[in-house]
Amino acid sequence: MSTIITKRQFPHYHKYTMDLAGRPLTLEVGKLAELANAAVMVGYGDTRVLCCVTAAPRPRDGIDFFPLSVDFEEKMYAVGRIPGSFNRREGRPGEKGILTSRVIDRPIRPLFPYDFRNDVSVMCTVMAVDHDCSPEIAALIGTSAALAISDIPWNGPVAALKVGLVDGKLVFNPDAEQRKVSDLDVTVVSTGKKVVMIEAGANEVPNDVMFEAIKQAHEENQKQIALINQMVQEIGKPKFEYPHADFNYELFNKITADFMDEAKAAMDTDDKNVREQRWNAMIEKWHEKYLEEYPNMDQYLEEITYKFQKMIVKKWLLEGHRVDGRQKNEIRPLDAEVGVLPRVHGSGLFTRGQTQVLSVCTLDTLSANQKLDTIWEETEKRYMHHYNFPGYSVGEAKPARSPGRREIGHGALAERALLPVIPPVEEFPYAIRVVSEVVSSNGSTSQGSICGSTLALMDAGVPIKAPVAGISCGLIQDDDGSFTTFIDIQGVEDFHGEMDFKVAGTKKGITAIQMDLKNDGLTMEIIKNALDITYDARCQILDQVMLPCIAEPRAEVSKYAPKMVTMHIDPDKIRDVIGKGGSVIQKIVAESGAKIDIDDDGTIHIASPDAESCEKAKKCIDDIVFVPEVGQLYYGRVVRLMTFGAFVELAPGKDGLVHISKLPDKRIEKVEDACKIGDMMWVKVTEIDEKGRVNLSHKDAMKEIAAKEAAGEPIK
């Protein structure tokens, strides 16, 4: 009996296409990952990303948050490479993968129902990469489409676009070559009406240019929205019903009625610890008064606290009152200090209210650059910023752990903010690492890290183009659509507010933006308002606090930092400097005590704890690559005597012949009558033959020296 094989059919396969920034965008459904709630294969140019969304059928018990996980998987086969790990498998997500996961998470999370407690997984797998077509944008679009057509409750869709600035013109989804020269890299995610996410790095771009880029991206995003809405109409599934999170509104109403005045008094302080102590004392009173009537009240207390505090904070902010008594455009008390730690290369302490960040800068040779093995074009990083957030910074007793996604995201934001002002390697040939230790946190620690990094870099003598400061802007909206924005949000305002709009930059313009939302998006009016007030605030921070602390980078690097010398040689001479099996360069390193890095273009960076070792290594390399020039004078040592002349060493391993007739002015019978081994003499290069042999003349050299002395010219 023969085996029966039937060709597999895909009756639910659909393909949707559109043009996106001059390149084809395709969304394919119904062929891959059929068991997921929804799956979309996104094609953008030659980039391919499979986006799958899955939801648990029942809510998770005992939680008061939405359990959403977003993973952006970078497969090395997508760029035709085998992973460099020991077992040649992809390991944990890299920094860029984590940051991309966060970029996807932030715009989609606020659009899920507030009381949805089912686990939801978003998995974006990069399967092929065309560097002209961003996998990040493809993953955002695919995630939006998959959630929109799935049966998972979600209030999308969203659309995403990158905008660059090339030669003063805005460019949608710039290709690889355009990105290299672009002064702007902003990702804008929109719904049909509002902007829900902004992530930007920029080369000191003015507010009006940034606003125009966001505005145009939002308008362009509507084309994607229309395509995804078409998919929903044609193949979308009905959203499933879910059990709404339980909440005791009766108890909540009693507590707010009985304890409103006491709650306001508890909230009205600029001290985070005092606020928490007052609130905890008030919760004990709730227990005494209501526990008998509501024996299970503990399961609602966290949600009651959140809603109660938000009610107060929202009302106050709309009235122009803040929990610590500040005005909406008032920044908390600031302080800046440099040179905080001994022996480190540079340090800065930035304090804003109860938020304190200690940033420390370390300089090293270029061999310390971070090597990157990813699907992205960048292969190494010279400037690195790392952010640490220990438990004690918020008064929590918890052990130290490796950095999580939040720490990596905050560190990357501060890194992006300072990168445009970091000097080029030709001007400052050091690898640079800044570590920001959050020692106390009451909101805006990422912006504190930006200010602290600037202080540490300047204290370390890094010649940054301009100082950078960061500030955050919050938002509260009323039910009628009216809103108020406020500057420098602290922890409780961040927790209960609707927006954390972080902007970093110099006086000239913006270097980084990150926007987090808890609502359904921002109008253009709110975005413009946020850009305007953050500009004024960061200029005040620079002028009134940071620049009075340290007006410009120190003239020299720390005495504890490695000394650096940069030189350039003919690339053809690199093999001579390295030697067979590295023998020559290893000898130079051993004799001089210096570190040596050689680039393919012939640039050599020499580093050592002291300048003497650098100069010693430089002289060794100069001697190796030395090439005599016809007509030049050299002062060399006699190393060999022959019957026909003397060999003079011009540099180690490089000598030339002075014929007996070119030694003295008078006729001599023997070479020994004019010189002996070890004598030093001036010689002039008269010829270099086709075999590279160098002919010298002592006689011509002395005549030229005499003429220069008579004319008062220096002898080189």
Task: Give a label for each model feature.
Residues 106-114, 149, 365-368, 390-395, ...:
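Conserved helix-loop functional segments at active or binding sites
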Residues 151-267, 457-555:
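Mobile "lid/hinge" segments at catalytic clefts and subdomain interfaces of large enzymes
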Residues 560-562, 571-716:
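Single-stranded RNA-binding regions, centering on S1/OB-family and related RNA-binding modules
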